[in-house]
Amino acid sequence: MNNLIKSKLELLPTSPGCYIHKDKNGTIIYVGKAKNLRNRVRSYFRGSHDTKTEALVSEIVDFEFIVTESNIEALLLEINLIKENKPKYNIMLKDDKSYPFIKITNERYPRLIITRQVKKDGGLYFGPYPDVGAANEIKRLLDRIFPFRKCTNPPSKVCFYYHIGQCMAHTICKKDEAYFKSMAQEVSDFLKGQDNKIIDELKGKMAAAAQTMEFERAAEYRDLIQAIGTLRTKQRVMAKDLQNRDVFGYYVDKGWMCVQVFFVRQGKLIERDVNLFPYFNDPDEDFLTYVGQFYQEKSHLVPNEVLIPQDIDEEAVKALVDSKILKPQRGEKKQLVNLAIKNARVSLEQKFNLLEKSVEKTQGAIENLGRLLQIPTPVRIESFDNSNIMGTSPVSAMVVFVNGKPSKKDYRKYKIKTVVGPDDYASMREVIRRRYGRVQREALTPPDLIVIDGGQGQVNIAKQVIQEELGLDIPIAGLQKNDKHQTHELLFGDPLEVVDLSRNSQEFFLLQRIQDEVHRFAITFHRQLRSKNSFSSQLDGIDGLGPKRKQNLMRHFKSLTKIKEASVDEIVEVGVPRAVAEAVQTKLNPQETEILLQVAEERVDYQTEGNHNKP
């Protein structure tokens, strides 16, 4: 805590308001609200905190505060400040997505469309739906039952949908506005769950079609009835009153909060929204902040009712949402809130279980590996692999794992400089010497374990360099592969022995990931180098084509094949002189050049013969 913060803490009032934490760059990193600014802000700089709060406090260099008249005013101000500044430590919704709605437009001849924007334009909106796929599924069903206008064709024309019975083409059929308004009401009833009338009508049409031997049409009606039934089963009935409501529940544990929102539309649970985040204040206060952001950030249709848990300030939510706010005490609505709370608890438990498994895969694996090899826990592991084809473009690569996870910023590539031909042992000797000679010279952090992708020979070479030449004391292990090129055995010790390692253990899976990663990194580098060398060698020896022009050609055409296929004019456009461009084509396409020369010679011979035969 610096002197500026100490001085400001003495000046804090006991009023409600918002406080704004800033980092060394003056950037707002956290916005909070408080019933008592003095107590809340001082609490950040006193006593011990959990890890996430310690991380926040470590970055605070300055703070500001704004006094408000009430707690609710502080809540509204906090939400606006978060929206405006997007502080990195605040609750931020996972994304800014808006949910799709089905809309019946308020036009003379209504249309049925999908939209993500709810406007006060007289249209009828139904939703939100969990995703556009779900909305499209329902709209496709409605299109087959209700032939709304779909086109904007002139009066003399009809659209494709007219021919398949999904557009009434009002300009041709002369249907009046009342017909379409009536159909809009039927759709509204259908989407509210009152679909028995539609099903009865479809059953009647199916029976009539069957009686007149129109079996294909009868089958279409049957499919529609089945589709409605399928839709019914997907939308579980949660309430008998067919109301639209959002149901909130939350659960907290280990400094984290999960909020779940159930979207109940026309009495059916159609989707839920789940968010997990660390909280820094009282849980009920951060829950209110979340609710405010939820309705402010999303293009969200405010429902008839919002159901909230018992411990939440009802008046505060009313200030955030223009809807009927209920804290149900019993019955069906109470069960809905309890269900949301239960799901929030389950989601949070799943997060911690996954986190434990992740720790087991990484931290647990390196601890077990250390015990198995009887060395200190190998926090930093460096692994090496060589790659070459018949000794051409030999390379080596090093990958680094820290705390059981790849540390890609520490990866290194090596071109083999002192070895001629395919000599894997000599290549390993060179790379180990270069890497750990540099570690010594520059006092770099040495690894806790070196893993060589290879057998006894490669490991012994690495040991000679590390222990005898450089005098370093770093444990070295080898990973041998089987004939299927899969991780097979771990070699360790002096003399080297096969370590008894369970293939189902997390430490085995860690070594497998390390071996796969170093192999991938080495072979990718080798391919890049081989491709580059191939490109350079084929363009070497062309007068006027230096490294810069070669680079420009590669940057423009991306590959040697495309340069071969390019015309002289296309090569000239890259900034290569015409004579040089012609030389490039001659070098890359010798057969075509030879054919052209042959044709030119034949043409000259023919013209010469013709001149000799003239009188």
From Swiss-Prot:
Q: Give the matching PROSITE patterns.
A: GIY_YIG, UVR, UVRC
Q: Where is the GIY-YIG domain?
A: 14-91
What's a Gene Ontology MF term here?
Answer: excinuclease ABC activity
Alphabetized, the UniProt keywords read:
Cytoplasm, DNA damage, DNA excision, DNA repair, Excision nuclease, SOS response
Q: How does it assemble?
A: Interacts with UvrB in an incision complex.
This protein's GO cellular component annotations are: cytoplasm; excinuclease repair complex
What this protein is called in its record is UvrABC system protein C
- SUPFAM superfamilies (alphabetical): C-terminal UvrC-binding domain of UvrB, GIY-YIG endonuclease, RuvA domain 2-like
Q: Which NCBIfam families match?
A: uvrC
> Residue span of the signal peptide, if any?
none
Q: Which family does it belong to?
A: Belongs to the UvrC family.
Is DNA damage a UniProt keyword of this protein?
yes
Protein source organism: Streptococcus pneumoniae serotype 19F (strain G54)
Function, as annotated, reads: The UvrABC repair system catalyzes the recognition and processing of DNA lesions. UvrC both incises the 5' and 3' sides of the lesion. The N-terminal half is responsible for the 3' incision and the C-terminal half is responsible for the 5' incision.
Q: Which domain of life is it from?
A: Bacteria
Please give a single GO biological process term from the UniProt record.
SOS response
